[in-house]
Amino acid sequence: MSRQKKSKAVPVVVFLTILIAALAVLCFLIKPLVIEPQKDAIAKANADAKAAVEERNKKAEAEYKALIAELESEHNKPTNPDWPEHDPSKEWEILDLSNIPLENQTAETRTRADLFQYGNEMLLVNAWHSRPENDFNEAELKSVSKARSGDQKIQAKDNNVLLYPKAIDALELALKDAKAAGYTHYMVDGGYRSYKTQEEFFNARMEKLSSKYSGEALVEAAKKEVNYPGTSEYNSGLGFDLRLYDRNDPDVGAPKYSTTPEGKWMNENCWKYGIIFRFPQNAWPLETSTDKSFKTGVSVRLNLYRYVGKGNAAIMHYLDLTMEEYIEYLEEHPHIVLFENGTQKYEVYRQLVGDAPSFDVQLTRSTQSWETSLDNMGGLITVFNY
């Protein structure tokens, strides 16, 4: 019985085997006719899609480059058609826009207290323009030596050397780049002096001269050696002395500061950080320096620097102007723009506000980056950064 079942199963197995073999052969024969063309079609579709994407990317990249070129071209042109043409080949150029208003003009209200809170970087303090005592704010003055720590710490004579934060920030950047160039050992030897401290210095000088002079002659004699209280650059909170010092090597501070590589580097580069050398004289601190004591009223050689802001410092540097001369320049040219290597860098606008307790600062919508400062000569100087 089992033999009969087995004999009947054999043909079925053989049949199935033949069928499977036939299907395999059929698949083998069909593959080049159906499957391969499908694979080729899919591969071609993928290649076409990839090529289309690459083409779109190339087109988009070309459009992007064209747009950037157009924007750069527009950026290098005066934004106002009334502006005079500038020469993009020049390292720097200043255009006088005094008869042209600010473009896309707007305004924001400020008070004198607002500007005095953090130090007016363009506040002129000299023998003819004393510090406005009723407005001056000492609250934001900071200790130079305590303002930073670690590698950023600034060396100062002691913890009582004070400056406004914006001056400390600028000095920190300058010292960082000086260090990268191989120049170190700078020390802030003097900073802010209060009215009371300056008064003590002045009275001490008068006492010393009292054996030779009296009355008004005594006051005038003392003024030649020590600034009258409120008229010293040290009263601004933005002026500071520099010298070299290393407590482990007294020879570091032996040479005259201005003759050292460190002093020369600082005097040549400080303007890039918004800092100016305050009282230049003939061939001092640099061989190219011209005597400006007739403008500053200071003929004593002091290694004294003053923070005025990058835009103001750049223009003073290019035009070789002191603060006094720069403000006089802006009185005659109240709206100017500075181009560096063909690119608009700073725009400066001076408006008259007098002694008003509050005023509308005239602004342009062309940039959101700006700083404004009273100049102690009835003006408000606003610098727009581009």
Where are these regions (language model features)?
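Extracytoplasmic cell-surface/polysaccharide-interacting catalytic and binding patches
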Residues: 5, 11-191, 195-386
